[in-house]
Structures are given as structure tokens and as C-alpha cells.
């Protein structure tokens, strides 16, 4: 999402207040640049779904897919990244659907014009191959 949203100034992926401070600094160049703070995942996801924020097509996911992507981030990614000792149980039946939604979002975003310009042909092929491998793994 960050690559697809990032504009030439880099402020489009920042928290709103941070982006405002950065734009002001660009104008004045007084002092040190403000500390950059990336917008949270939910904000970036929302921004990527709005045409005004994207070059080319916005991210288009069904409401169920959007819910699954948010759940993957909130319930799985955050709990793994910010580990707190506790018991875990992962709903095996719903996990392939949730991962498919994330793969679909990734596939749509890597075809965005901004991302396309940033990736070499080799990287594009590797990403396409990895997404295909994951999809095939989900079907087996």
C-alpha cells in the first residue's frame, strides 16, 4: 500500500498532522525536518481505496475482503508482532479465505502505476511467482 500511495513528496503515506508539518517544512525549510510517522494500516487501507489518493485505479475489494484484510492485520499480524504470552487458537477454516483476500489486495496493488514504475522486471516476476505459489498452496 505504501508504494502505491506514496507521492513524490512522500507525505501521502504519513499521519495527517505529520504530513501537514512536513508540507510546511518544505515551504519554509526552517530548522530540521519534522519526524516522519507512517499512517496506521487502517488509514493506509482506506486511502488506497479512494481514487483521489491513487495514481491509476484505487484498490477495489468486496466488503468481505476488506473485513478479512483488516482482521488479518488486527488479529494475526498485531498479535504476532506485539507478542503477549497467551494461548492461541487460529480458526483454520476461515484462514485461507482471509489470506486469499490479502493476496488479492497485494496483487491489485502491485499493478498500480506508481508501484509498476518502482519495481524492476525481475521483482515483478518474483512477486507474481510468489503470489501464484501462495494461491496454489491455499487450494491444496
Task: Give the residues covered by each predicted segment.
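Short non-catalytic regulatory patches outside canonical folded cores
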Residues: 2-63, 83-86
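Polyanionic, low-complexity intrinsically disordered segments
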Residues: 37-53, 64-71, 75, 79-140
